Amino acid sequence: MGQDNSTPISLTLNHWRDVRTRAHNLSVEIKKGKWQTFCSSEWPTFGVGWPPEGTFNLSVIFAVKKIVFQENGGHPDQVPYIVVWQDLAQNPPPWVPASAKVAVVSDTRRPVAGRPSAPPRPPIYPATDDLLLLSEPTPPPYPAALPPPLAPQAIGPPSGQMPDSSDPEGPAAGTRSRRARSPADNSGPDSTVILPLRAIGPPAEPNGLVPLQYWPFSSADLYNWKSNHPSFSENPAGLTGLLESLMFSHQPTWDDCQQLLQILFTTEERERILLEARKNVLGDNGAPTQLENLINEAFPLNRPHWDYNTAAGRERLLVYRRTLVAGLKGAARRPTNLAKVREVLQGPAEPPSVFLERLMEAYRRYTPFDPSSEGQQAAVAMAFIGQSAPDIKKKLQRLEGLQDYSLQDLVKEAEKVYHKRETEEERQEREKKEAEEKERRRDRPKKKNLTKILAAVVSREGSTGRQTGNLSNQAKKTPRDGRPPLDKDQCAYCKEKGHWARECPRKKHVREAKVLALDN
């Protein structure tokens, strides 16, 4: 093997795909360029003995990690890289030679001139008295089974060893008990993963349990949870959802559960929760039991001796957490008040699924019924239909075979109506068109009356033109009695041509006879 492959940094760069896979398994992201820069240029300046070619010496890695994780003057961007270095040293891959595993770096604590120590940082959160309710006795660690050492010649603390109380690594440094004992210039919680029970290595046996290490909740987490959630009496859903999530993700111990109850709930709320939880302890038949010995065994009020590194201890903790969540849900119920359930109405822009969730939460809070049970599906469905928005309610009531629809089917039908609703722009355009159509209908009678008036005026003007001898009108006249019109040289009296009526000889003869008769 050449010289280039004998240094830790060259080994990691030559097997970068394996290193990156290791980082992904640790839920962190690393870059090859930064990996080389931190190892060869940045960490050697910390003055803890880190060589530019890198090292797998755990004592040096822990020293660098302490500086990286410092609250004041730390290096958050370097956290993923030193975490992966530590994992490579604790769980070396096959391509790491034995000589690299046992390499010893001398003078690991030589200070570097020109790097003054950072001043102590003032506390972020106020020192409230409610965070000290369980300060005595301090949170355990319970006795943890240590994994076997990596190699007989390995130097540095084993991976499963509990940190010393004077070394404020890990989330415990943020708690009040650790903060009181830790020196001011050495504070810095390890915030990589803050879990009360954290896996610290591979199982001691091929089919054994993964060993867990205890890390108590930090005061910052407790303060944030208390400040950012309404009280349990005001809105039980907030804290119930929080604790249900914590029971699944953080795997709290019995002491952690008591600390959460002390910090987040009042005395009356805490008593109700514990009482409801003990009512929900399941017996051997899977139904709630009333046997005192089984209740005390599954949900003890005094601190039990459960070892979380054994299968029996983990099972006990799992049952305890599940029972505590059942107690939270039971204590969240109020006296039966169906009027409160009927007050839950769907908002104008509220999705049907969100409305259904609010409706079911009202059932859980104000009725003794479980809305998700099979027997309550019909009641919840009728309430969902009757209290939906008007357009959705109208659609659901017209469905054929409504009694055969499940709650999920009703939500799907409601979603169709909800997503077919017009947008704000479409609504404005529709209202504009409706207003224009209404204006046209209102103006239509006026236009009709105006047309009649204009027709009458035109007719009157035509009549006036005929009376004044308008030739154009005369030419267009047609005889009313059906007689043909006269020619221009035709007599109107005798109908002969060549003279007019005043010159008609027949008509003149008659007149002369009458005149002669008068003379006689």
From Swiss-Prot:
List residues with covalent lipid attachment of type N-myristoyl glycine: 2
Tell me the PROSITE patterns matching this sequence. Answer: ZF_CCHC
Q: Segment Disordered: which positions?
A: 110-199, 419-489
Motif PTAP/PSAP motif, which positions?
116-119
**According to its UniProt record, how is this protein modified after translation?**
RNA-binding phosphoprotein p12 is phosphorylated on serine residues.
Residues the record annotates as the site (Cleavage) are 125-126, 195-196, 454-455
Any one Gene Ontology MF annotation carried by this entry is: structural constituent of virion
Keywords, A to Z, come to: Capsid protein, Host cell membrane, Host cytoplasm, Host endosome, Host membrane, Host-virus interaction, Lipoprotein, Membrane, Metal-binding, Myristate, Phosphoprotein, RNA-binding, Viral budding, Viral budding via the host ESCRT complexes, Viral matrix protein, Viral nucleoprotein, Viral release from host cell, Virion, Zinc, Zinc-finger
**Sequence motif PPXY motif, location on chain:** 139-142
Where on this chain are zinc fingers (CCHC-type) annotated? 489-506
Which residues fall in a compositionally biased region of kind Basic and acidic residues?
419-442, 478-489
| GO BP of this protein | viral budding via host ESCRT complex
Biased composition (Polar residues) is annotated at 461-476
Composition bias, kind Pro residues: at what positions?
Answer: 137-151
What cellular component GO annotations does this protein have? host cell late endosome membrane; host cell plasma membrane; host multivesicular body; membrane; viral nucleocapsid
InterPro entries in UniProt: G_retro_matrix, G_retro_matrix_sf, Gag_P30, Retrov_capsid_N, Retroviral_Gag-Pol_poly, Retrovr_matrix, Znf_CCHC, Znf_CCHC_sf
**Official protein name in the record:** Gag polyprotein
Q: Which gene encodes it?
A: gag
